[in-house]
Amino acid sequence: MPPIALLSVSNKEGLIPLAKELSIEYGFEIISSGGTAKTLQQAGILVTPVAEYTGAPEILGGRVKTLHPKVHGGILAKKGDLFHQKDLKDQKIKAIDLVVVNLYPFQETIKKPNISWEEAIENIDIGGPAMVRAAAKNHESVSVLTRPEQYQPFLQALKKGTLSNEMRRELAKEAFEHTANYDNAISRWMKLNAEKKSSQWIESIPLKQTLRYGENPHQSASWYSHQDQGWGGAKQIQGKELSMNNLLDLEAALSTIREFGYDENLLATTSQKAAVVIKHTNPCGVATANSVSLALKKALDADRTSAFGGIVAVNSSIDLATASELKNLFLECVIAPNFENDAKLLLSEKKNLRLLEMNKYYIDQSERNNIRSILGGLLIQESDDELIDEKSWEVVTKKQPSSIEKKDLTFAWKVVKHIRSNAIAIASSGQTIGIGAGQMNRIGAAKIALETAGDKAKKAVLASDGFFPFDDTVRMAASHGITAIIQPGGSIKDNLSIEACNELNISMIFTGRRHFLH
């Protein structure tokens, strides 16, 4: 009796060569359903339609094709089990040796604009996952292929006679991963369209890359990413392989630069170009200007010592002038919406420098959750990426900030939310001039930021990610010449800070919004 292959695929890539080789070279009888059978018949390949084999027609508009004992009995029967073989014989069921199935394109369907609920639901495969799971369960007797990339290795194993149980077990593992990813895509889509939060967190993300190591050389690390979201859509156009530390810093850089708009067409839509320099996930320099090259220069000038070996992000296309500034620096990575051709050519001389293009589409498609692992579980929160709402701000001092101060306060507030707590940012003329990050007390963060700013702190503004528990930060700021402050407010001793500001002729804004970052 010839071996039997059941073929039912949505992705027809590689289908005809596979079926021809199975049929001609190895004598497989091919059973197939629907569009797959039609494709094979048009290619001149002998096929037994599923409906002909089972004696049951497709019903419910194609919703039921392969859900039949003659299909699932043939897949699930163990070859070495006499009782199973007797059942097959009694029921006139053929044992199936190979299942080649990939599923309805649900993930592709839900990417379409204005997709209806009904269309998405109709692209949820039922029979396909059932066959894949059945074959994977019975992998000692049945091989299962779920991706075109598996076809040639499988045929090579057939040719060499090396189709081992170990290979079938690996194919079974990949099959269960395939159906798990599929079910997760459906679950995620329904979750996004549901009003209530899910009682379980289910996520299935494919492996993109095994990294050289983690934060330190003795730690192993891997990178998992959706291909159509976030970093899965980033294009590395040159440079060494990304490390885990690179990715963490790039995430911090992208989160910060998005505060100022991020678009490859930004040159035509706004005059606010921005540049960010990141070191160990903290901004060490941020600036805005009328050109990307000037914004970059200002961001670097904020703290050139810390910028050494850092990550740079800009929010618009990198032109030749910007590339000329970058060429003279030692940096790990540069990320932008786009690199102009002459900029690419110039930077290609720095072969180790990693250049990445990130299209705004992939950022917008990302589900914005912040996930942290703890012992035995996960902590999941919404990402702190809401836009600034200045209407909710309140000037709580007698002195009002000037228009120039207000502009710098807004700038500093955008930056400070991306600095590790306790965080202080000092800014002047659209440029950070002092940053205090990750301190155990707020006055300590302010001291670092003010000392970094030096004489530039005179007539500058200060932003704090959390409230002032005492008036000591205000008084220290005043002693260095700070003229305006922005902070969340909310301390039971807010009045002390307000009184100190009034005494020292400093304006202060309460935003009503805290931005801790741990």
From Swiss-Prot:
Pathway: Purine metabolism; IMP biosynthesis via de novo pathway; 5-formamido-1-(5-phospho-D-ribosyl)imidazole-4-carboxamide from 5-amino-1-(5-phospho-D-ribosyl)imidazole-4-carboxamide (10-formyl THF route): step 1/1; Purine metabolism; IMP biosynthesis via de novo pathway; IMP from 5-formamido-1-(5-phospho-D-ribosyl)imidazole-4-carboxamide: step 1/1. It catalyses: (6R)-10-formyltetrahydrofolate + 5-amino-1-(5-phospho-beta-D-ribosyl)imidazole-4-carboxamide = 5-formamido-1-(5-phospho-D-ribosyl)imidazole-4-carboxamide + (6S)-5,6,7,8-tetrahydrofolate; IMP + H2O = 5-formamido-1-(5-phospho-D-ribosyl)imidazole-4-carboxamide. One of its GO terms (molecular function) is IMP cyclohydrolase activity. GO terms for cellular component: cytosol. Keywords: Hydrolase, Multifunctional enzyme, Purine biosynthesis, Transferase. Pfam families: AICARFT_IMPCHas (PF01808), MGS (PF02142). Gene3D superfamilies: 3.40.140.20, Methylglyoxal synthase-like domain. Residues 1-146 form the MGS-like domain. InterPro entries: AICAR_Tfase_dup_dom_sf (IPR024051), Cytidine_deaminase-like (IPR016193), MGS-like_dom (IPR011607), MGS-like_dom_sf (IPR036914), PurH-like (IPR002695). One of its GO terms (biological process) is 'de novo' IMP biosynthetic process. The keyword Ligase does not apply. It comes from the Bacteria. Its EC number is 2.1.2.3, 3.5.4.10. The IMP cyclohydrolase activity resides in the N-terminal region. Belongs to the PurH family. This is Bifunctional purine biosynthesis protein PurH. The gene is purH.
